[in-house]
Each structure stands twice: as C-alpha cells, then as structure tokens.
C-alpha cells in the first residue's frame, strides 16, 4: 500500500510504503507499467471553469477530420475512439488514466483530448501524462469551496501549463508543445 502516513509500516497485514505524494507516485508508476503511451500520442489538456466540454468536443472533431481517430476524456464520458464509457470523474485517477491511454493506443488513436479539472490538477491525478498542449478557457468564481480563493484556484489551473513546460524540457519530447489561452473572457 502506498500512502502519506510516515508512521505506518503495514496496513491490514500488507506492506505500507510511505510517500509524500502518493497520488503522484501512483500515476507515474501506472503510466510506466503500461509503457507510457502518452509519449507516443499527442495529448491536449483543456482546463477552465466553463467551456471545457464544448472546447474538447470541437477540438476532437477537428482532429478526427484532419488526423483520424481521436479519443476524448471528459465530463460526459470517455470516447475511446468510437466506444463510449461512462465517466465517474471528469478527470479520472492516474491508474485509470494509464489504462485508458493504453486502450486508445490499441485503437490507433494518435490524439487524445481531455478535460482536466482543477481538482485533478491539485490532487496530481494527471501525473505521468506527457501533455503537448494546454488550453485554458476561463476562470470564474466556482469551486471555491475546494480551493478557498481565486488565487489558489488559478494556481491549480496553471499546473496544466507547467506540465507542458515539463514536456518541453524533456529529453524525450515527442512533438510540438504549446499553450492556448482564451483572452475573451
């Protein structure tokens, strides 16, 4: 068991491994175990208070017409390149995401568009994903029950751009990387 309690050595009779950021570690491990499929795909992450779903669907349609099969993970469900799966979360946890990316790779989807919630960014559910594009739709007063103030909320959203910057600095960079910000709102 991987967790953030340094006082434990075992839990329920199983070995307990302390980790300061267990969700991040679990995501990195899960992606590594399935061969890091996002290193071979173009990953477009879309964040913002409103407009993520519409932007994701429009982007998916453009990519499908110009590049072929394209997956879409978001609020309404997960399109695995023609097969729909119900979505328990807008952005699933790292272990589930790794399995989804592997599945869409098997289905010959070279591009994946995904909504990336501020909760997922804050909770490091997207650790291990090699993003090529970060898109930001807008920021309005929502989810302040979780983030407490607008500054903290914005910092969570900007983590998606930090992930693209990580990819830009990576020795294993796999395609162009850039950010898109909606300046109209």
For each predicted feature, which ranges?
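Conserved lysine of the Walker
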Residues: 52
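Conserved beta-strand scaffold positions in the cores of enzyme catalytic domains, especially
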Residues: 16-18, 43, 70-72, 134, ...
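Acidic, Mg2+-coordinating active-site environments of NTP-dependent enzymes
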Residues: 3, 7-13, 122, 131-185
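Flexible beta-alpha connector loops of hexameric P-loop NTPases
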Residues: 83-94, 142-147
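Residue-level signal for inorganic ion chemistry
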Residues: 1, 29, 46, 73, ...
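Conserved nucleotide-sensing/catalytic segment adjacent to the nucleotide-binding pocket
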Residues: 88-117
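Short, basic phosphate-binding NTP loop
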Residues: 1-45, 55-67
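Short beta-strand-centered segment that lines the nucleotide-binding/catalytic pocket of NTP-utilizing
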Residues: 67-81
């Amino acid at each position: 068991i991987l967790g953030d309690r340094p006082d434990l050595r075992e839990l329920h009779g199983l070995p307990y491994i302390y980790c300061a950021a267990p969700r991040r570690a679990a995501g990195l491990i899960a992606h590594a175990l399935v061969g890091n499929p996002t290193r071979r795909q173009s990953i477009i992450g879309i964040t913002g208070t409103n407009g993520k779903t519409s932007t994701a669907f429009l982007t998916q349609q453009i990519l499908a017409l110009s590049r072929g099969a394209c997956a879409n993970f978001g609020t309404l469900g997960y399109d695995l390149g023609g097969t729909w799966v119900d979505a328990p979360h807008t952005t699933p946890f790292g272990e589930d995401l790794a399995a989804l990316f592997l599945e869409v790779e098997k289905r010959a989807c070279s591009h994946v568009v995904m909504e990336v919630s501020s909760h997922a960014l804050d909770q490091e559910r997207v650790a291990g994903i090699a993003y090529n594009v970060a898109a930001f739709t807008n920021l309005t007063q929502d989810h302040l029950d979780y983030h407490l103030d607008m500054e903290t909320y914005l910092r969570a959203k900007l983590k998606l751009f930090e992930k693209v910057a990580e990819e830009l600095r990576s020795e294993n960079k796999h395609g162009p990387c850039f950010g898109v910000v909606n300046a109209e709102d």
